[in-house]
A protein has these predicted regions:
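The conserved acidic donor/metal-binding loop of glycosyltransferases
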Residues: 111-116
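Conserved donor NDP-sugar-binding/catalytic core segment of glycosyltransferases
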Residues: 119-151
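Acidic donor-binding loop at a coil-to-helix junction in glycosyltransferase catalytic cores
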Residues: 183-191
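Glycine-rich, basic loop-to-helix element that forms the pyrophosphate-binding segment
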Residues: 85-102
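Short aromatic/hydrophobic "clamp" motif used to bind/position activated sugar donors
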Residues: 107
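Acidic donor-binding segment of Leloir-type glycosyltransferases
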Residues: 42-84
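N-proximal low-complexity "stem/linker" segments adjacent to membrane-targeting elements
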Residues: 2-47
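Cell-envelope/extracellular polymer assembly enzymes that use nucleotide-activated donors
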Residues: 23-26, 56, 190
């Protein structure tokens, strides 16, 4: 990735040297049979306030519906690294392979079926640099349920907790702290040494809106339907997060 000047709408700490503002970033996306979601994730990446020239998009695809045909036409636009596996792998192993393939010094997760804020990359990089940590994420998540169009907030759990979709980190950390390759969910537990690794918290509104739909690998309806002190229904509406009507219409009934 070549160096390029650029600006972001996020206010950067004045103490940071300008040459450190835009380290090369790899956006990481493991995907499995999510063809209908990927065009909207592309829109989320296009909307990022971080300089496009300083980002690449690394996709690991082990679905039975190969999405190579969807991604090849935009390979140049997104500085794409596409990895195809004919064998379905556990999510822990997929994360590890994405980490190895990434060329950026900072790795930012964007899962295939969620909505990401335009400040997602910029805020993650800013926090990593300003806090001088190797790992950032959010223990609070905002969830949109497509079945009843309600928005909930879950968390916080603890200061070092974060879900993988919210996390960003240095490549050095990722390579030296692999996920358990045998796990099919909750891979962040092994990645963070059971949440003992220091993690700087991000504002969840600057990260993502978790889309809870019928195809989720883990049914998030369990979070909503089981009484919990960390799960709260909000009065927020989808338009508070997604301003573009066409995109909002898709996610509202995804």
């Amino acid at each position: 990735m070549s160096a390029a000047a650029g600006t972001v709408t996020t206010e950067w700490p004045a103490c940071l040297p300008k040459q450190a503002m835009f380290p090369p970033v790899s956006i990481l996306t493991p995907t499995y049979n999510r063809r209908r979601f990927l065009p909207w994730l592309m829109e989320c990446i296009r909307a990022q306030t971080y300089p496009r020239e300083r980002m690449e998009w690394v996709v690991f695809d082990d679905g039975t519906d190969c999405v190579r045909d969807l991604l090849e036409p935009v390979a140049k636009e997104f500085n794409l690294v596409y990895i195809r596996s004919e064998t379905k792998l556990n999510i822990g192993e997929k994360r590890n392979r994405l980490h190895v393939a990434a060329r950026g010094t900072i790795l930012v997760n964007m899962d295939d079926d969620d909505y990401y804020a335009a400040e997602r990359v910029a805020c993650a990089v800013q926090t990593l640099l300003a806090k001088k940590v190797e790992l950032v994420g959010s223990t609070r998540n905002i969830l949109y349920y497509t079945d009843d169009e309600s928005i909930w907030e879950v968390g916080p759990y603890n200061a070092n907790h974060g879900t993988f979709g919210t996390m960003a980190y240095t490549k050095k950390y990722a390579i030296t702290h692999p996920c358990d390759p045998t796990v099919v969910f909750a891979e962040e537990i092994s990645f963070t040494n059971n949440y003992k690794t220091p993690l700087a918290q991000l504002n969840p509104e600057k990260v993502m809106l978790v889309i809870c739909h019928s195809e989720n690998t883990f049914s998030k309806s369990k979070l909503r339907d089981a009484p919990s002190p960390v799960m709260r229904k909000t009065g927020l509406k989808l338009r508070s997060f997604i301003r573009k009507k066409e995109m909002r219409d898709f996610y509202s009934h995804a």
